[in-house]
Amino acid sequence: MYIAGVMSGTSLDGIDVALVRIEGSGVESKVELIHFTTVPFCNDIKSEIQQALSIENSNVQLICSLNFKLGLCFANAVKEVCKEANFSLEQLDLIGSHGQTIYHQPKQDGNRIPSTLQIGEPAVIAYETNTTVISNFRTMDMAAGGQGAPLVPYSEVILYRDPSKNRLLQNIGGISNVTVIPNQQSDQNVIAFDTGPGNMIIDEVCQRLFQLSYDQNGEIAKQGRVVDEILTYCMSHPFLKMNPPKSTGREQFGEKFASELLKRFEKHSKENILTTVTMFTANSIVHHYKKFILPYYEIDEVILGGGGSYNSTLVEMLRNGLKDENCAIFIQEDIGYSSEAKEAIAFAILANETHHCNPSNVPSATGAKQSVVFGNITFPPV
């Protein structure tokens, strides 16, 4: 089957689309990446998404309209990946669309029950591409008592499980998450959870202090030094003390967190603040390894993916934090994969599993009561 995996993440960089060929299903799946592209959001759409994400500035009219606008954007992104690959849209069998997360509440808060909302209307995508769309991947896991995240461990087992090596798959997107993949002979469980911020705080600080969308290759962070009082403040966040399974998002590490941090520590230099929040991402990852993973698993390799793996300052901080742990650290490209395409490929795989009616959540990662089939299916017009 030819499947397009579509992902718009918490970093708001744009729409990632992976055109993938998949044979079979389950752990025997054969997955081939044909082409990958990122279609940037235009400034107007990005601004509307940022407004929709803000509890103070959002409204139901905006979210309703944006749902359909993003559906059209996602459909156009699918057309673009096919065009770049010289691949006929008519050959496409399926689209797996994660959508744009507007709000994610993994645990009950007062009278607010666990819930999640991703937008990007699948009916619009199906109509515009004349292709069946699988979307809304998180909701069934949450209906079964899970946190609806992380979603990608199932696909990571298919792609990265090794005959003899125990691996950690560390994704550093807007939020960071880790998947522990024991080797094929092991009887230990796959576990996965969010480790905290990835690029989200770094990007927010860059935008506010340097008028840049991100710190390219970590060049600015390389110029500063870590400020202990800022790092201590960050590392005291309650999320770091919670036991897995757990998930987080912009609600805890987004604009509000960055705004309060900058106000509290405004006396410090811009470079030092950016260096310190970069170290916060690295330290929060290392903290979770040492507390929740390394006492129970012997890890041979750590494989980094997502946009944060291109931040050499962040990667060096991670290497230093793990230098005594006797595990090799790679990025996706070192082992023949793409850091950028990883999550879009995952949603192509998850769409394929839903098409075959296979459960694809990992209850040991999400906390769900049982394995479930992900997603809603939207058919194109006859």
From Swiss-Prot:
GO biological process: 1,6-anhydro-N-acetyl-beta-muramic acid catabolic process; amino sugar metabolic process; peptidoglycan turnover
The protein's enzyme class: transferase
Position of the signal peptide: none
Pfam families given in the database record: AnmK (PF03702)
GO molecular function per UniProt: ATP binding; kinase activity; phosphotransferase activity, alcohol group as acceptor
Chemical reaction(s) catalysed: 1,6-anhydro-N-acetyl-beta-muramate + ATP + H2O = N-acetyl-D-muramate 6-phosphate + ADP + H(+)
Swiss-Prot/TrEMBL keywords: ATP-binding, Carbohydrate metabolism, Kinase, Nucleotide-binding, Transferase
Ion transport in keyword set: no
Highest rank taxon of the organism: Bacteria
EC number(s) from the headed UniProt entry: 2.7.1.170
Biochemical pathway: Amino-sugar metabolism; 1,6-anhydro-N-acetylmuramate degradation; Cell wall biogenesis; peptidoglycan recycling
Residues at which ATP binds: 9-16
InterPro entries, alphabetized: Anhydro_N_Ac-Mur_kinase, ATPase_NBD
Functional summary from the UniProt entry: Catalyzes the specific phosphorylation of 1,6-anhydro-N-acetylmuramic acid (anhMurNAc) with the simultaneous cleavage of the 1,6-anhydro ring, generating MurNAc-6-P. Is required for the utilization of anhMurNAc either imported from the medium or derived from its own cell wall murein, and thus plays a role in cell wall recycling.
Family: Belongs to the anhydro-N-acetylmuramic acid kinase family.
Designated name of the protein: Anhydro-N-acetylmuramic acid kinase
Organism name: Bacillus anthracis
Lineage: Bacteria, Bacillati, Bacillota, Bacilli, Bacillales
